[in-house]
Amino acid sequence: MDKILLEGLNKEQIEAVTHKSGPLLIIAGAGTGKTTVITRRIAWLLSEGLAKTNEILALTFTDKAAHQMQERVDILVPYGYTDIWISTFHAFGDRLLRENALVAGLNPDFKVLTRPEAAVFFREHLFEFGLSYYRPLSDPTRFIEALIALFSRAKDEDISPGEYLSYARELKSKAEEEPENLSLKEEAIQQMEVAHAYAQYQELLAKEGLVDFGNQFYLSLQLLREHPLILKKYQEQFKYILVDEF
């Protein structure tokens, strides 16, 4: 079995596939076989008895890449990938939240808003965000899509509403120290507006028991940070964590 799993791999790829313990970073360009190495490694770990299927976590960024990884492992592993955790970061976060929903303050069947649904949700609460610049009278919904995208990016970067507000306040203080800098003053006003809207958006989602795409990642991080026993449970479960395109 090992010979088949290592077939067609170069020396460096074989070393990566058969690496037994400790962290390992692979730096390689597109199309160089990184996903192949990860899928072969999953199969090799199982064939060597170094891990059970539910002790391996493989993460990637896109649904397409996750499905591709699942298909390849399904071919390599006789009994399939059923119990192997192969998913995107957001899908992994979603699974953590559902498995620990009550602790996270969520209904286990919570709804995940799509981007269009998040925009509709924002529009329904438009006058609760205290917007001025980002709610122009001529076109009140003009910036909704941009704000939703910004909030999502902030959560993907693990920036909390509190941290964003701190940044906006620092910018405001700097602008007050440079009263002649009108562009800085305008930016500070805008960022303060965004910061308050971001915090309000998160509060409204929580109040209605909803989760958006960014919250799948962000809230799962919060869950692990705030609940050491839950973190420990997953640390003990996963003997090997493989990340595609970290």
Identify the meaning behind each predicted range.
Residues M1-P108, V112-L113, A119, K232:
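P-loop NTPase Walker
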Residues E7-T18, G22-I26, V37, L57-A58, ...:
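Conserved helicase NTPase motor core
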Residues K20, V73, E99-N100, H125-F129, ...:
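Alpha-helix boundary/capping residues
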Residues L24, L46, V77, A104, ...:
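Short amphipathic alpha-helical interaction patches enriched in hydrophobic/aromatic residues
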Residues T53-N54, Y134, F213:
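A local structural micro-motif
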Residues P116-L210, P228:
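Basic/charged alpha-beta structural segments of nucleotide/phosphate-handling enzymes
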